[in-house]
């Protein structure tokens, strides 16, 4: 006898229902992975348990991209099928879409922070680990790039400061050389053109009135000769005549 068709219905026993859910969920995840690998298809699988726990599978961990693509496709189809649909319905669908996207982002954020990991399968944990490793590599690469750019900027500023210091030092040396050359030129001019010493100040001597009265005052006659010698000779003759009797008297006294 052949095996009859098993009727599908809800399992009443909670333990059996939980075991069956775990087995079927694992098989479903395996089938989704197989079809994505064998057929090169983009697969997104979302499963909620009866307790509200979320289980998902996505090709290459791109659940958000697949869901956004699905939303665009379904929205375009709805626009083609019912172009005159009510605007309220469109707003309601848009609200539900954004709400689901926000919930997905919040859940991924909790996973990135290491929260709510109990409901994740080993495959999901592996995908999360790969995502974190990739993100960590990007972060380290960006940090290293910023540090490298900062070092290059500091080196550029240092080089500019060194060039400025060199230019200032060169200008200072050139200025010192110019001043030194000017000083040497001034020294050579002073040594080469020595001025005679200034004359000493004149001393005012007090002279006797007799000397002043008898000081010769030469004058020029018509012939261009001075009469100083004639006047001096006349004065000596007068002096000899006046002193001769005195000398004779004294000599007579000594003879007696």
UniProtKB/Swiss-Prot annotation:
The keyword Transcription regulation applies. Induction: By cold shock (e.g. from 22/17 to 16/12 degrees Celsius in light/night respectively). GO terms for molecular function: DNA-binding transcription factor activity; protein dimerization activity; RNA polymerase II transcription regulatory region sequence-specific DNA binding. One of its GO terms (biological process) is positive regulation of transcription by RNA polymerase II. PROSITE patterns: K_BOX, MADS_BOX_1, MADS_BOX_2. Pfam families: K-box, SRF-TF. GO terms for cellular component: nucleus. It is found in: Nucleus. Its main location: nucleus. InterPro entries: MADS-box/MEF2_TF, MEF2-like_N, TF_Kbox, TF_MADSbox, TF_MADSbox_sf. Keywords: Activator, Coiled coil, Developmental protein, Differentiation, DNA-binding, Flowering, Nucleus, Transcription, Transcription regulation. Residues 187-206 are annotated as: Disordered. The keyword Nucleus applies. Residues 1-61 form the MADS-box domain. Residues 88-178 form the K-box domain. Homodimer capable of binding to CArG-box sequences. This is Floral homeotic protein APETALA 1 A. It comes from Brassica oleracea var. botrytis (Cauliflower). The gene is AP1A.
């Amino acid at each position: 006898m052949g095996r009859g068709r098993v009727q599908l219905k809800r399992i009443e026993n909670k333990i059996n229902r939980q075991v069956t859910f775990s087995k079927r969920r694992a098989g479903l995840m395996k089938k989704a992975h197989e079809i994505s690998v064998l057929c090169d298809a983009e697969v997104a699988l979302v499963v909620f348990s009866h307790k509200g726990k979320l289980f998902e599978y996505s090709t290459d961990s791109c659940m958000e991209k697949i869901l956004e693509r699905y939303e665009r496709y379904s929205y375009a189809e709805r626009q083609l099928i019912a172009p005159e649909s009510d605007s309220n319905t469109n707003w309601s669908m848009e609200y539900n879409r954004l709400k689901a996207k926000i919930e997905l982002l919040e859940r991924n954020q909790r996973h990135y922070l290491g929260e709510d990991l109990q409901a994740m399968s080993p495959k999901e944990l592996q995908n999360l680990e790969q995502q974190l490793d990739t993100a960590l590599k990007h972060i380290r690469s960006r940090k290293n790039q910023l540090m490298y750019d900062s070092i290059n900027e500091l080196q550029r500023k240092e080089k500019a400061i060194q060039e400025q210091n060199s230019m200032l030092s060169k200008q200072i040396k050139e200025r010192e050389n110019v001043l030194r050359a000017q000083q040497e030129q001034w020294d050579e001019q002073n040594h080469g053109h020595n001025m005679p010493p200034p004359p000493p100040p004149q001393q005012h001597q007090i002279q006797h009135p007799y000397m002043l009265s008898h000081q010769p005052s030469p004058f020029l006659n018509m012939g261009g000769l001075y009469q100083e010698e004639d006047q001096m000779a006349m004065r000596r003759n007068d002096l000899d005549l006046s002193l001769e009797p005195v000398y004779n008297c004294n000599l007579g006294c000594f003879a007696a």
